[in-house]
UniProtKB/Swiss-Prot annotation:
Coiled coil: none annotated. It is a multi-pass membrane protein. This is Probable G-protein coupled receptor 174. It comes from Homo sapiens (Human). The chain crosses the membrane at residues 28-48, 54-74, 92-112, 135-155, 183-203, 232-252, 270-290.
Length: 333
């Protein structure tokens, strides 16, 4: 096929394939992501007062993942039925929620890595660091991310329909934007939203690895460093597996949708690659609970059989006690 071949419908042959990938991926993610993140919130709530090691950031990361997971049934419906009957408002909100989840996940993964790194490298300086500061950092992060991600739905339109079919998600048409402005926005977004966070996580990983090379480390200190390194490495792994492919394919996909790339073969390859990258970007919703389990001792302890049994009994006794007290209290007229 000639390189300068222009497609009238470059995605026509790949639409069913891409829809199938999305539907299968989101179905696979849905149940593990829902159960895993609900369990994560329950566990973190239980030991929130016991530790200062980034638990507030982990709670916010689990909330971000849970919001994404709760929108998956609507995405699955669309990709199975090839139509969106729920109105443009809900479509744009779910589309917007995808990016909020992604960049909130990136933000809180960075916060977790930096917090563990600081506790490791400067234990006395940050030993008495109060959780309220982590709460303020989390609130500020949510506000910035929610405002910044408004740009994504603003660059799409929900007015286009094909016959009786209403488009949503990846099929939303892109608004006409000047190419120079698009390049500037994408460059700023890539640098702030991915490159800088990735460099921060890689720096924390590198410095933690160097700290393990001390000639005479104390046994307790060595154990703390190994646990911190495990957590930071898993954060870096999520970045590279889930978010790197998307941030590489996103500018290319934008150029395809803006008709700046004319080669039919190149357009089809980019659309398929971007579809796979989108699926990988959603995978973090069920990967994060696995990370908590394998990199956090408290998480494993809390989910152990005995601790789980004791916690359920404690919650049951608390519920019965509160219910009994409320029924014995006379009603006020």
């Amino acid at each position: 096929m000639p390189a300068n071949y222009t497609c009238t419908r470059p995605d026509g042959d790949n639409t069913d394939f891409r829809y199938f990938i999305y539907a299968v991926t989101y179905t696979v993610i849905l149940v593990p992501g829902l159960i895993g993140n609900i369990l994560a919130l329950w566990v973190f709530y239980g030991y929130m007062k016991e530790t200062k090691r980034a638990v507030i950031f982990m709670i916010n990361l689990a909330i971000a993942d849970l919001l994404q997971v709760l929108s998956l049934p609507l995405r699955i419906f669309y990709y199975l039925n090839h139509d969106w009957p729920f109105g443009p408002g809900l479509c744009m909100f779910c589309f917007y929620l995808k990016y909020v989840n992604m960049y909130a996940s990136i933000y809180f993964l960075v916060c977790i890595s930096v917090r563990r790194f600081w506790f490791l490298m400067y234990p006395f300086r940050f030993h008495d660091c109060k959780q309220k500061y982590d709460l303020y950092i989390s609130i500020a992060g949510w506000l910035i991310i929610c405002l910044a991600c408004v740009l994504f739905p603003l660059l799409r339109t929900s007015d286009d329909t094909s016959g009786n079919r209403t488009k949503c998600f990846v099929d939303l048409p892109t608004r006409n934007v000047n190419l120079a402005q698009s390049v500037v926005m994408m460059t700023i977004g890539e640098l702030i939203g991915f490159v800088t966070p990735l460099l921060i996580v890689l720096y924390c990983t590198w410095k933690t690895v160097l700290s393990l090379q001390d000639k005479y480390p104390m046994a307790q200190d060595l154990g703390e460093k190994q646990k911190a390194l495990k957590m930071i490495l898993t954060c870096a792994g999520v970045f590279l597996i889930c978010f790197a492919p998307y941030h590489f394919s996103f500018p290319l996909d934008f150029l395809v949708k803006s008709n700046e790339i004319k080669s039919c073969l190149a357009r089809r390859v980019i659309l398929i690659f971007h579809s796979v990258a989108l699926c990988l970007a959603s995978l973090n919703s069920c990967l994060d609970p696995v990370i908590y389990y394998f990199s956090t001792n408290e998480f494993r302890r809390r989910l152990s059989r005995q601790d789980l049994h004791d916690s359920i009994q404690l919650h049951a006794k608390s519920f019965v006690s509160n219910h009994t007290a409320s029924t014995m209290t006379p009603e006020l007229c």
